[in-house]
UniProtKB/Swiss-Prot annotation:
Chain coiled-coil ranges: none
Gene3D superfamilies: 2.40.50.580, 3.40.1350.60
UniProt xrefs under PANTHER family: SUGAR FERMENTATION STIMULATION PROTEIN A (PTHR30545:SF2)
Family named by the database record: Belongs to the SfsA family.
Pfam families linked: SfsA, SfsA_N
NCBIfam families linked to this entry: sfsA
Record InterPro entries: SfsA, SfsA_C, SfsA_N
UniProt-recorded name of the protein: Sugar fermentation stimulation protein homolog
MF GO annotations: DNA binding
Length: 244
């Protein structure tokens, strides 16, 4: 996924009201931009961090600029625009870069499904195998406090929406379709992923139950720069549970 036109650079002053951020440009002026991230953004939104943003030519947008990447003072790159994760995974699937998801004939996005009025991020279909339902989650929380280098967690805040998605995925698996939770690692410092029991215990418990019901968990890491984002490698998920 190439950024075109090229991203512009600034310095973060503050993020506020969840969806807004004030950024100082290189000429000293300050602009307000949209932040497409509903999470806590722990470690991703420290004042003084370098931010990279895109600009839309859509005149109907209230804020023309969108915060895309953070470059931390520790040198890490983070994609904070969670909308990029789904597009990145779709791109990787179509290019055959995720071996576990090869062999399907059709791909759809944002398809209604389930009993709780949900939409699945990606639906793969094939005449020769069951449908494959894929829910994509961005992983940007790096926590090395315990000395565990490269440890990433999801979620970074309590997520009732994420809990609902796990229930829906579990039901799909029980009905005989293939059901996948795919963690897209969008932080250059994260080398492995674990459920954030210390942040959302209910999510962790539901994830374990979903795996026992047959939900698969995949973790793929992206390479990040101001020029492009692309999936490059599979990383370890720390709590794989086998189906009952």
């Amino acid at each position: 996924m190439h950024f075109s036109p090229p991203l512009q650079k600034g310095t973060l002053l503050k993020r506020y009201k969840r969806f807004l951020a004030d950024v100082t440009l290189e000429d000293g002026s300050v602009i307000t931009m949209h932040c497409a991230n509903t999470g806590a953004m722990t470690g991703c939104a420290e004042p003084g961090s370098t931010v990279w943003f895109s600009t839309s030519d859509n005149p109907k947008r209230k804020y023309a600029h969108s915060w895309e990447l953070t470059q931390t003072q520790a040198g890490h790159w983070i994609c904070v625009n969670t909308a990029r994760a789904n597009a990145l995974v779709v791109e990787a699937i179509l290019a055959g870069e995720i071996p576990q998801l090869r062999g399907y004939d059709a791909l759809s996005t944002e398809v209604k499904y389930g009993h709780e009025n949900s939409r699945i991020d990606i639906l793969l279909k094939s005449d020769s195998q069951p449908h494959c339902f894929i829910e994509v989650k961005s992983v940007t929380l790096l926590d090395e406090i315990q000395g565990d280098k490269g440890q990433g967690y999801f979620p970074d805040a309590v997520t009732t929406r994420g809990q609902k998605h796990l229930r829906e995925l579990a039901e799909v698996a029980k009905d005989g379709s293939r059901s996948i939770l795919l963690f897209a690692v969008l932080h250059s410092g994260i080398e492995k992923v674990a459920p954030a029991l210390h942040i959302d215990a209910n999510y962790s418990q539901l994830l374990k139950a979903a795996q026992e019901a047959g939900v698969e968990v995949l973790c793929y890491k992206a390479s990040l720069s101001k020029h492009e984002i692309r999936m490059v490698s599979e990383v370890k998920f720390a709590h794989q549970v086998t189906k009952n």
